[in-house]
Amino acid sequence: MGQKLSGSLKSVEVREPALRPAKRELRGLEPGRPARLDQLLDMPAAGLAVQLRHAWNPEDRSLNVFVKDDDRLTFHRHPVAQSTDGIRGKVGHARGLHAWQIHWPARQRGTHAVVGVATARAPLHSVGYTALVGSDSESWGWDLGRSRLYHDGKNRPGVAYPAFLGPDEAFALPDSLLVVLDMDEGTLSFIVDGQYLGVAFRGLKGKKLYPVVSAVWGHCEVTMRYINGLDPEPLPLMDLCRRSIRSALGRQRLRDIGSLPLPQSLKNYLQYQ
């Protein structure tokens, strides 16, 4: 799933986009996942109405980016030189477990493509090219090209992520990744190719955080799709039973639920219908 790329950080900036990471390199290395993450990902993805409610905020952005009229889940960046530009999502999260997908074509990332979360106070524009998300104490970001985590980056060095990377290695990423924000535990994590990469940031409890990215590539287009969320309260017993049955069947056999000797109402419940 993950592929290590050796070389200096400078070479990482200009490298050709890597092929889809080879999963064999991370076998046995997956860190412990948040307790309820599998439950969230087993749920049907949010519908379009919910996705639009959690989409990029056209009123909370750098002036050099705009949300597309024909695709409200996607923003486009104008080709402005010596500028780093960001945008926040509409909905901030202070509680619960949330996941959203970021689709950012590798060839449109350039030297500073950063994905993460931010408070409402974090800046969304900077002169020059920089890892804007994570540059101050109001945002937390993963630089996709350098494979570095930044928070208060003006005063602290970046940290390699995923954790198995060496100091001069980067991580070949596909076009899409999942962001996992657990405000009950106060953590931010990422999933690539179905592989949980471990906790990137801790200590986020007590804040209200919004999805955010910052970009430098002219004409880049980045799409955000909210996957789903779980409230902090314990799940009802029926939901836990459904999760247990679906886990026992496995993803490949979920299509067989319709043939089980069960009442139709229960079959429907198992299929989230």
UniProtKB/Swiss-Prot annotation:
SMART domains in the cross-refs: SOCS_box, SPRY
Keyword vocabulary terms for this entry: Biological rhythms, Cytoplasm, Ubl conjugation pathway
Protein localization: Cytoplasm; Cytoplasm, Cytosol
Pathway annotation: Protein modification; protein ubiquitination
Main localization of the protein described in the UniProt heading: cytoplasm
Membrane-crossing residue ranges in chain numbering: none
SUPFAM superfamilies: Concanavalin A-like lectins/glucanases, SOCS box-like
Subunit structure and binding partners: Component of the probable ECS(SPSB4) E3 ubiquitin-protein ligase complex which contains CUL5, RNF7/RBX2, Elongin BC complex and SPSB4. Interacts with CUL5; RNF7; ELOB and ELOC. Interacts with MET. Interacts (via B30.2/SPRY domain) with PAWR; this interaction occurs in association with the Elongin BC complex. Interacts with NOS2. Interacts with EPHB2.
Domain (B30.2/SPRY) ranges: 34-233
Protein name in the entry: SPRY domain-containing SOCS box protein 4
CDD domains cross-referenced by the UniProt entry: SPRY_SOCS1-2-4
Classification of source organism: Eukaryota, Metazoa, Chordata, Craniata, Vertebrata
Organism this protein belongs to: Mus musculus (Mouse)
Cellular component, GO annotation: cytosol
Family affiliation: Belongs to the SPSB family.
Annotated gene: Spsb4
Function: Substrate recognition component of a SCF-like ECS (Elongin BC-CUL2/5-SOCS-box protein) E3 ubiquitin-protein ligase complex which mediates the ubiquitination and subsequent proteasomal degradation of target proteins. Negatively regulates nitric oxide (NO) production and limits cellular toxicity in activated macrophages by mediating the ubiquitination and proteasomal degradation of NOS2. Acts as a bridge which links NOS2 with the ECS E3 ubiquitin ligase complex components ELOC and CUL5.
Domain-related comment: The SOCS box domain mediates the interaction with the Elongin BC complex, an adapter module in different E3 ubiquitin ligase complexes. Essential for its ability to link NOS2 and the ECS E3 ubiquitin ligase complex components ELOC and CUL5.
Domain of life of the source: Eukaryota
A Gene Ontology BP annotation from the UniProt entry: rhythmic process
One example GO MF annotation: ubiquitin-like ligase-substrate adaptor activity
UniProt domain SOCS box: residue ranges: 234-273
